[in-house]
Amino acid sequence: MQDQKPGGACASCRYMVEWGQTLQRRADMEISHFFMNGDIKGAIAYMREHEEFKDILPAYVAIFENGEYRRFDVPDKLNEILLLYQIYYRDTFYCGLPEAEAAEKLLAGLKALLNVPDAEEALLTERLHAVFEAEGYHALFGKTQGYYGPYIWRETVPTVYQVELPDGTAEYTVNILKGFVFRSWMDYLTFGRFGTGGWASPDGTINCIEQAYDFESERFLVSLLKHEAQHTVDMKQFPGITPEELEYRAKLVELHYSGNLGLLQKFLSEADESRTGDSHAMASARIKREFADTDQRSLPCVQARALELLHAHTDEMEEKYGKQKTVSNG
């Protein structure tokens, strides 16, 4: 057998694999628009026209066209509850029932199942919690981006991190949520390809869904841990700090530690001074102004500028709120 020369059959195979991956990414991006818009009929039509979805298409046909719903590895009583949510998703995203009508049908079904026909939604939520917790599950109910959907998982693991920040080290606790059974509507519609990565508890603790994160990634270590730890430090150091000021400082910390130039571009794309009630948009607008004269193609320049702005803003905060003792474990 002759050796393959560079650029021969092996290179062709590699090219075909890379091209195939490019097509798959493009297809994923295109079909994601259907899911984001809650258009399951459109998604199914798209899948029928694209060979790369042939393996998953039958699952969509079974649920949405035939009404053959999924059963989960939980007790029957809990499956009965989750079935009502699945019917709500089919009604809303496939059958075209207005969300308000589908929600009314869902809530009526849940009340009947739990034998609380006249319960207000708050009481219904309490009963749902109790039913799942009695079987050893954690649960969160309510709406995500306008649609009902429960989060059901088996284990919550508080994990303490020592987070390096520009002015010292902060201790920050993250709840890692493991063993998910159900992760609301987007996860259900996409069989786990898309979905919520976590949320903040009322006390500010971040809850991270284990399957949604690479815990060695910059997304977790910088955009989540350092961002949220900086919030914690700033709220202790400057009790009167505004949401816009909090976000501005946390974004600067991200930019200082990030190895990705695309992060700055992401913030610039979010800048919008007309959205005065949106702390993220306003913070990004300030960043856009203050990085206008920075070489945005140079990572060291971006990192240095971010640190310079953070220190200047700390001086501004101390003048505004009074100098407090620095919160640091390092």
Where are these regions (language model features)?
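N-terminal maturation segment of proteins
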Residues: S12, L23, D28-P58, L165-F180, ...
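Auxiliary, metal-adjacent structural segments of Zn-dependent hydrolase domains
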Residues: E121-N207, D214-F215
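N-terminal low-structure segments adjacent to metalloprotease catalytic domains
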Residues: Q2-H138
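Long, well-structured alpha-helical subdomains associated
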Residues: G259-G330
